[in-house]
């Protein structure tokens, strides 16, 4: 497998360098039957998009935009398909073999191997139409996720544009502690483990030093490790407040993994920018998030999937049992989030092969299909501070464009068939050619 990934990496580097050296130099005119206006939540029929370089320069009725296109324009006919903006995943973990869910999976491979796996994984996000993602933190001493982010930005490899957290900041023995080994086999202390207020501040500064865009705090225990309790608050409110203070002073944002009620509320009071999961969200917590404008990234489908898989996945039996226990709280918590009009952004927190599952889970949980799509477009762009660049198809924004068969505003399962992907004006996927 590693050999195949290496071969793929070298191919991607060659392609990436070619892309970097030869950006699109002819205007592109995309024609489509249906275009979803994510800002309005409506569909416009018989539309066209004129693209120059990496940017949308005009969008509107096909009969009008086509007249404005220059003579040498390249026409991409997406008639019969639905066009929408490139999608955004706000809770990704890109490093390593994402099908190995064991507690020591990352300890069995080097940082270099984990990063090579990341190159492979990023192609799957693109396959599903995700042209931007936020890595929600890793356990990699080499910060491979930041190397991938920068390599994509430089055009060395192909992948979604990335913003990224550093490594999970956790208490010793908490959900972000990579050491699941026996006491007499313990790992040396890692810089992301912090048991004091000053220790948390130092861990934040360590991540910032090496280029993190976001800081990831483990406010509570979690599911996938065999040690922590998802009900238990781990980092104290004082620790999280200090982390937010240090991060915000450096113009970095903060996300908090928070499953249990106490940890959710402490993280919100501490001033974090987004709550990840929020699985046991109660009325008090939802009202507090609404008042403070804190984002929620609910990651619904991953727990639903974990509750159905067995030990062949690598998950520890303790983690499997926790996933089944926590699932009973999920639906009520999501309903509270909707009732309190919380700002919700799309996040998978799983193997990207399962990306369409999250759309279906949010619709099953109470969002309309259009609202679910907005979590991965306009809402996600707002959370990441990128609304002026991505999230909707408008003049002056990035030409991140995807097309799907069917109409996902009436049947969210249409998101399972992404057939065309463009990022920054470059066509990266077009399976229509295979169908002809």
Where in this protein do the model-derived segments appear?
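Histidine/acidic residue-rich metal-binding segments in metalloenzymes
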Residues: 147, 198-296, 324-344
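Metal-associated gating/positioning segment near the N- to mid-region
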Residues: 81-156, 172, 238, 262, ...
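Active-site gating loops and adjacent loop-to-helix segments of metal-dependent hydrolytic enzymes
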Residues: 96-114, 172-188, 223-237, 292-328
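Histidine/acidic-residue-rich catalytic or RNA/ligand-binding cores of hydrolases
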Residues: 98-99, 145, 174, 225-227, ...
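Divalent metal-dependent hydrolysis catalytic cores, especially in the metallo-beta-lactamase
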Residues: 119-143, 158-168, 212-225, 253, ...
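Histidine-rich, glycine-flanked metal-binding segment
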Residues: 22-26, 35, 40-84, 152
């Amino acid at each position: 497998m590693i050999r195949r990934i290496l071969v793929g990496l070298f191919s991607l580097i060659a392609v990436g360098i070619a892309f970097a050296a030869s950006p699109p130099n002819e205007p592109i005119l995309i024609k489509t039957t249906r275009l979803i206006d994510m800002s309005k939540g409506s569909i416009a029929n018989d539309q066209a998009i004129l693209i120059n370089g990496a940017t949308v320069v005009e969008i509107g009725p096909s009969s009008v935009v086509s007249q404005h296109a220059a003579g040498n324009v390249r026409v991409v006919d997406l008639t019969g398909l639905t066009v929408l903006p490139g999608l955004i995943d706000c809770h990704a973990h890109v490093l390593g073999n994402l099908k190995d869910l064991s507690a020591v999976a990352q300890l069995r491979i080097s940082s270099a191997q984990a990063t090579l796996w990341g190159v492979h994984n990023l192609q799957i996000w693109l396959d599903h139409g995700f042209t931007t993602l936020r890595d929600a933190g890793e356990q990699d001493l080499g910060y491979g996720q930041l190397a991938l982010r920068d390599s994509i930005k430089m055009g060395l490899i192909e992948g979604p544009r990335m913003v990224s957290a550093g490594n999970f900041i956790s208490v010793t023995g908490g959900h972000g502690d990579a050491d699941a080994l026996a006491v007499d086999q313990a790992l040396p202390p890692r810089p992301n483990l912090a048991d004091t207020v000053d220790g948390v501040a130092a861990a934040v500064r360590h991540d910032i030093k090496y280029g993190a865009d976001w800081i990831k705090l483990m406010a509570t225990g979690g599911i996938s490790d065999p040690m922590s309790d998802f009900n238990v608050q781990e980092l104290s409110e004082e620790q999280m407040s200090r982390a937010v203070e240090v991060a915000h002073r450096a113009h970095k944002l903060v996300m908090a993994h928070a499953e249990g009620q106490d940890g959710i509320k402490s993280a919100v009071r501490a001033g974090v920018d987004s709550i990840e999961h929020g699985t046991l969200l109660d009325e008090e917590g939802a009202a507090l998030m609404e008042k403070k404008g804190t984002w929620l990234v609910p990651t619904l489908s991953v727990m639903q999937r974990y509750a159905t898989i067995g030990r062949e996945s690598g998950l520890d039996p303790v983690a499997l049992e926790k996933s089944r226990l926590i699932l009973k709280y999920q639906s009520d918590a999501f309903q509270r989030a909707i009732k309190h009009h919380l700002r919700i952004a799309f996040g998978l927190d799983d193997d990207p092969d399962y990306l369409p599952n999250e759309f279906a889970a949010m619709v099953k949980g109470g969002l309309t299909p259009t609202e679910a799509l907005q979590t991965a477009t306009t809402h996600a762009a707002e959370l990441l501070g990128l609304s002026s660049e991505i999230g909707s198809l408008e003049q002056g924004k990035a030409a991140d464009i995807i097309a799907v068969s069917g109409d996902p505003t009436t049947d969210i399962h249409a998101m399972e068939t992404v057939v065309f992907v463009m990022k920054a004006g470059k066509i990266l996927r077009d399976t229509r050619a295979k169908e002809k």
